[in-house]
């Protein structure tokens, strides 16, 4: 399978570059900006893309790629900072510009001579995000596009006193605001690099089945399954590879949505998985009694989950995890692991403690690709399009201390909210939606009597990957209907609010 390497210089758009490449049915990987050329050679890429970044190439601490990558004979495309890094390396002049360019800008494409990167692309709007610019081209390079504020918006090497097939774009072709960005990437990858677009869900599945069989051999494998998209797709893919060697465990921690355990077991049954239901709800709730701190809740739930999961491990040698590519990128990127905002509840501590070897069949995929693989595997759409649900469950949606009564209040209210979203055709239009029971009571009037009851918040967000999110502008009449139903049908709530915070600065979940 032919591939492209994206070297990460710290751009907020690096993952987007990789995703745009995959949309062209070409496999892409992200590596740190300083990956040695010898390492790159072992990957045998057909092209290299240098991402943007927040730094200036003329700073003493500027990030620069291994110079030897330009001698590999592989086409290279620099984007924004990547263009400037190429210009500096080959002797061009890069400096701070008096006129910064941020947002939309119109470029003029050079029409004289051959211009393969801009083949069949007219003058058009692009997305700029730079304060520095190339003041003077290196020897052996020519400008191929310009804007009002930048005479050099794009360039290419001529192959005379410079290597062949080195290209640069000062703007961001990966961003949707660049009207012909996908076509530019297509020109570079399909025409200039002559890559065969052979990356697809089907080819991925075929490759992973071979890898899983090779890795697992005749050993038994265990998988914690939650009913969410990632764990379900991972389990079905592994099951397709090794069949009855896979043992799945669904842990009921007492913090699930209304009838969640029964629903999950019901819709997973037709998928042919061997699943054990471990009902440990009493144990979880006993240990969480009186605990109000969200971080303490997460830690208790995490430790208890490991204990319960450990009891289900017998002779298994491997553990399946639904790790996705953004998790992998986070650990190897130029920025390194981000500051921990919340501790994450998963079974990440199990392999070291239990001496289990990992099988991570989805570690090369983004979220949308996981769903595409799920469709190829025949997993029903209503499973694939389920909204994300946090590992700690309702423990982080009932703010403050947990009680059976408060959990039941939230379950009833949340079910009404989701039911109305589905009935209105809105469920599939938002990334995630849920209710939150606040540790606040308010005065109300019901039946001419004073009430002093709980406040509930409704949350719905729009996102593509959960890394950033905007609050969803749900119709007012819809919110009024949901609020009216909850207050009338759920005993213990007399006020409903709607959360209009985006991420950042807020997180999607409240705790």
Curated annotation (Swiss-Prot):
<dbReference type="InterPro" id="IPR001674">
    <property type="entry name" value="GMP_synth_C"/>
</dbReference>
<dbReference type="GO" id="GO:0003921">
    <property type="term" value="F:GMP synthase activity"/>
</dbReference>
<feature type="domain" description="GMPS ATP-PPase">
    <location>
        <begin position="199"/>
        <end position="386"/>
    </location>
</feature>
<comment type="pathway">
    <text>Purine metabolism; GMP biosynthesis; GMP from XMP (L-Gln route): step 1/1.</text>
</comment>
<feature type="active site">
    <location>
        <position position="172"/>
    </location>
</feature>
<feature type="binding site">
    <location>
        <begin position="226"/>
        <end position="232"/>
    </location>
    <ligand>
        <name>ATP</name>
    </ligand>
</feature>
<dbReference type="InterPro" id="IPR004739">
    <property type="entry name" value="GMP_synth_GATase"/>
</dbReference>
<feature type="active site" description="Nucleophile">
    <location>
        <position position="80"/>
    </location>
</feature>
<comment type="function">
    <text>Catalyzes the synthesis of GMP from XMP.</text>
</comment>
<dbReference type="Pfam" id="PF02540">
    <property type="entry name" value="NAD_synthase"/>
</dbReference>
<dbReference type="InterPro" id="IPR022310">
    <property type="entry name" value="NAD/GMP_synthase"/>
</dbReference>
<protein>
    <recommendedName>
        <fullName>GMP synthase [glutamine-hydrolyzing]</fullName>
        <ecNumber>6.3.5.2</ecNumber>
    </recommendedName>
</protein>
<feature type="domain" description="Glutamine amidotransferase type-1">
    <location>
        <begin position="3"/>
        <end position="198"/>
    </location>
</feature>
<keyword id="KW-0658">Purine biosynthesis</keyword>
<keyword id="KW-0436">Ligase</keyword>
<comment type="subunit">
    <text>Homodimer.</text>
</comment>
<dbReference type="GO" id="GO:0005829">
    <property type="term" value="C:cytosol"/>
</dbReference>
<dbReference type="Pfam" id="PF00958">
    <property type="entry name" value="GMP_synt_C"/>
</dbReference>
<dbReference type="InterPro" id="IPR022955">
    <property type="entry name" value="GMP_synthase"/>
</dbReference>
<dbReference type="InterPro" id="IPR017926">
    <property type="entry name" value="GATASE"/>
</dbReference>
<dbReference type="Pfam" id="PF00117">
    <property type="entry name" value="GATase"/>
</dbReference>
<keyword id="KW-0315">Glutamine amidotransferase</keyword>
<keyword id="KW-0332">GMP biosynthesis</keyword>
<dbReference type="GO" id="GO:0005524">
    <property type="term" value="F:ATP binding"/>
</dbReference>
<keyword id="KW-0547">Nucleotide-binding</keyword>
<dbReference type="InterPro" id="IPR025777">
    <property type="entry name" value="GMPS_ATP_PPase_dom"/>
</dbReference>
<dbReference type="InterPro" id="IPR014729">
    <property type="entry name" value="Rossmann-like_a/b/a_fold"/>
</dbReference>
<dbReference type="InterPro" id="IPR029062">
    <property type="entry name" value="Class_I_gatase-like"/>
</dbReference>
<feature type="active site">
    <location>
        <position position="174"/>
    </location>
</feature>
<keyword id="KW-0067">ATP-binding</keyword>
């Amino acid at each position: 399978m032919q591939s492209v390497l994206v070297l990460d210089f710290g751009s907020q758009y690096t993952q987007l570059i990789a995703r745009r490449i995959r949309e062209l049915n070409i496999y892409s990987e992200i590596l740190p900006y300083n990956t040695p050329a010898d390492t790159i050679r072992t990957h045998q890429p057909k092209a290299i893309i240098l991402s943007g970044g927040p730094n200036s190439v003329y700073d003493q601490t500027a990030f620069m790629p291994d110079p030897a990558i330009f001698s590999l004979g592989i086409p290279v495309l620099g984007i924004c900072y990547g263009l400037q890094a190429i210009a500096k390396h080959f002797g061009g002049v890069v400096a701070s510009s008096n006129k910064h360019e941020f947002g939309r800008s119109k470029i003029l494409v050079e029409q004289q001579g051959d211009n393969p990167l801009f083949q069949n692309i007219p003058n058009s709007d692009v997305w700029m995000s730079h304060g520095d610019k190339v003041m003077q081209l290196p020897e052996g390079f020519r400008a191929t596009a310009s804007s009002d504020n930048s005479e050099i918006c794009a360039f290419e090497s001529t192959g005379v006193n410079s290597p062949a097939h080195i290209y640069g774009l000062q703007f961001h072709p990966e961003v949707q605001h660049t009207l012909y960005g996908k076509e530019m990437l297509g020109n570079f990858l399909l025409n200039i690099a002559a890559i065969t677009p052979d990356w697809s869900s089907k080819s991925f599945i075929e490759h992973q089945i071979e890898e899983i069989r090779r890795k697992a051999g005749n050993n038994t494998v265990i998988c914690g399954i939650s009913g969410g998209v990632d764990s379900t797709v991972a389990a079905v893919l592994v099951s397709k590879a090794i069949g009855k060697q896979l043992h799945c465990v669904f842990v009921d921690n007492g913090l699930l949505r209304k009838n969640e355990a029964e629903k999950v077991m019901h819709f997973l049954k037709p998928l042919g998985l061997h699943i054990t239901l471990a009902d440990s709800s009493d144990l979880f709730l006993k240990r969480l009694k009186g605990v109000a701190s969200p971080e303490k809740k997460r830690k208790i739930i995490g430790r208890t989950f490991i204990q319960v999961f450990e009891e289900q491990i017998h002779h298994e040698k491997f553990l399946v995890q639904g790790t996705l590519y953004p998790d992998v990128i986070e650990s190897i990127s130029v920025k390194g692991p981000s500051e921990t905002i919340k501790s994450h509840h998963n079974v990440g501590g199990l392999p070291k403690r239990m001496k289990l070897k990992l099988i991570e069949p989805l570690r090369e995929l983004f979220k949308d690709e996981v769903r595409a693989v799920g469709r190829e595997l025949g997993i029903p759409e209503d499973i694939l399009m389920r909204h994300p649900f946090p590992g700690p469950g309702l423990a982080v949606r009932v703010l403050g201390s947990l009680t059976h009564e408060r959990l039941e209040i939230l379950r009833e209210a949340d079910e009404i909210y989701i039911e109305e979203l589905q009935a209105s055709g809105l469920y599939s239009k938002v990334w995630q939606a849920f209710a939150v029971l606040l540790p606040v009571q308010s005065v109300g009037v019901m039946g001419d009597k004073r009430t002093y009851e709980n406040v509930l918040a409704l949350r719905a967000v729009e996102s593509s990957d959960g890394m950033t999110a905007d609050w969803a502008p749900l119709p007012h009449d819809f919110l009024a209907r949901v609020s009216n139903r909850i207050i009338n049908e759920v005993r213990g709530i007399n006020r409903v609010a709607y959360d209009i915070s985006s991420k950042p600065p807020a997180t999607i979940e409240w705790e």
